[in-house]
């Protein structure tokens, strides 16, 4: 038995970069399973908390985020163990790795350029 669970998000995203690896924008669409009912902080996790953290450590002139929350027959979501930070960090770091591969650049070089 539990009173809340961690986040269940599906995130679709796009990162825009110049050919030299400079990040120019990020678009994130979040589909969030909110559980059977909302706790007091649950709506903030995929919206205010998560989306504001998507720049990570990088200079990023434009971030656009859209969130859709869905009530389901699962345990309600609540904030614990990072509350949006793990999702945001994984997403932006994975996008940087993919961008480096597509631009045939060293991922560390892209990270340094945008730090």
Residues of each region from the PLM?
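Short secondary-structure boundary/hinge segments and terminal tails
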Residues: 1-2, 34
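Beta-strand segments within the central parallel beta-sheet cores of soluble alpha/beta enzyme folds
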Residues: 1, 24-29, 107-115
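Short glycine-biased active-site loop of nucleotidyltransferases that positions the nucleotide triphosphate
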Residues: 3-7
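Glycine-rich loop/linker segments at domain edges
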Residues: 8-95
């Amino acid at each position: 038995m539990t009173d809340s669970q961690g986040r269940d998000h599906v995130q679709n995203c796009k990162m825009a970069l110049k050919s030299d690896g400079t990040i120019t924008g990020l678009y994130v669409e979040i589909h969030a399973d909110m559980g059977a009912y909302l706790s007091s902080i649950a709506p903030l996790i995929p919206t205010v908390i998560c989306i504001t953290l998507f720049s990570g450590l990088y200079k990023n002139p434009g971030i656009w985020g859209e969130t859709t929350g869905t009530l389901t027959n699962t345990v309600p979501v609540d904030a614990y163990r990072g509350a949006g930070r793990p999702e945001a960090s994984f997403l932006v770091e994975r996008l940087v790795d993919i961008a480096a591969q597509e631009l045939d650049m060293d991922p560390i070089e892209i990270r340094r350029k945008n730090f």
